[in-house]
Every structure is written in structure tokens, then in C-alpha cells.
């Protein structure tokens, strides 16, 4: 072990990786996942879907361009930790307002650098997503393992990240009124809707069908978010109550929630999909899209039979369901992130499809 290494990350199977700390200096019990994106660490760090998780970045250099005021995906990051090979404390970017470490300290995000992140990512790929503890290097392993065995990871994180009261994101010359259920919505989703002439009313995850309809929306959007979709029962009930009454579009967690509302089921993937280069085939056009993804759960393909939902997109790496629709109810959803941030913009047309649906086309 390098003598300069003052921190370690220990996995629930006892595997240890040593490094040096940056960001917040505290112990952190986390769910450990990995992301293969080369850039976009700021958007990843501020994505509410990573709540209570620590992200292993497989790209070796993180922090090179600092943190830019325009690139946050939430006002207050809720990620627990960041694991990197090397972080840059002196970024070179005219847009940078702060360093990565400054932001991590402000929001109590634990960091560990000097780790062989590609080896760690392979371990997660082979053994699966797991609990991990980031602690001082001298902390006895026996004590760490005992703490992980006795402490459960938090659940129902949607309740943590959702807005507490409705708010409006206006746009010039609005053509449509969209109600967006905030399960952990990213800023660029709202920007993508605003750019297409939608006034967006962002509402808490506990909103009722009656409250939504009282706003007289042209469409309903169900956002991304953290955790198990089965924990989001109020949103499942909302979709069940409003399906067929107005156009509905869901992304990521919203995709899973829609499946559950129709009677399908979901399951947890071994290590999830997180990165900016996942190939997805659009079964309606035959085209392949390169997509940005961040999720632990997926819809069971065989559970869709008899629900009224049909598969529209599939993942070309593992065959999982990436899109679904019920044309009769004017509802559709995708498992990936068409708003990118970070990632490719191959799937931005889905927002246009939502607009067309609200216009009755």
C-alpha cells in the first residue's frame, strides 16, 4: 500500500481498495456503482438518481474542467461519494466557477482518489452492485464489515429529492402546459420541454390525479429518480388513474413506474446501466441510437404480455426493455435519457413526439 494513501473503500465481500481522500472527510456507507462516461462528471455528480450511491468513474482523469454554474442538473447534489483514479484540483476552463473538490466539500460528498477504478469496475461487473464503506485507511476491516452487515441502505429516496411544493418553469410564448412529477427531475429535462414551447409545472411525487387535472395540463411527464420504482407507490397510482385521460411521457424511473401502473413488473439488474454510449434499437424504425443511461432497475419483458404496453426499444448489449408504449392511451416511455446531460443527443426526437401527441398528431 502506498504510504500516502489515507483512505480506503471496502466492499461488503471484504475486497479493499486504498487511495487518498478528497472532498468531505467522513465515513460513508454507500451503494457502489460505476459509470463509463469520459466526460460529464458534473452532471453525474448532480443527478438526483445517484442519491445515496457512490459512483466509480472508469475514465481516469476527473475534475479537469472544474464545475460550471450552468451545468448542474439539480440545485443540491445528493450523491454520497465519488471514486476516481485521479482528480484535478487545478482545472483549466474559462467557464469554471469552482473546483470539483470545493463543491464536494460544500455538499458533504466523500471522495477517494488513487484507486484502480477500472479494476474496481470489473469487480462490480462480475460480482454485482454492492454495499461499500469509505473510511480512514487504518479502520479495522472487521469493524467495517460488521457495520455493513448491521446497517441497511436507505430506501424510498424519491421522497428525499422530490420538490416539496409546486413551481413553474416558464418559457417565451408557451404553446403547451405540462405537469412534471418530480421524482428527481434533471434540469435539462425541463430545459428540453421549455425549448419546445412547454410551460412546465413541477409537482411533488405525492401529487394526486385530482390536483393534476385541476391544473388543466396538455400532458403529464414522469421523471427520472433514485431507487426502487416499487417505492414510488403514489406515482404508480397517479399513472393508473390518469392513463388514457391525457398524453403521458416517462423517462428512466418514470418508465419503470408506467410499467408497474399497467401491471407489469421490474427487477434489479446485476450492475445496472450507467454511461453515455449504450446502443439501443428503435424497433419502430430499425435505427440504432447511442444513449445516456443511469439506472439499476429494468422492466421484465415477459411481464408486459396482456398489459396493453408494447416494447418499442431494446438494449443491444443485454436485450433489456428500453422503451414501451400504449398508443390507445397516448402513453410512452424510455429507460434511457433523451435529454442527455451528459451524453449523445440521438434521442431528442422523443420530446418532439411528446409535443406531437399533445397536439393530437
Specify the residue positions occupied by each region the protein language model found:
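A glycine-centered loop/beta-turn motif at secondary-structure junctions
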Residues: 323-360
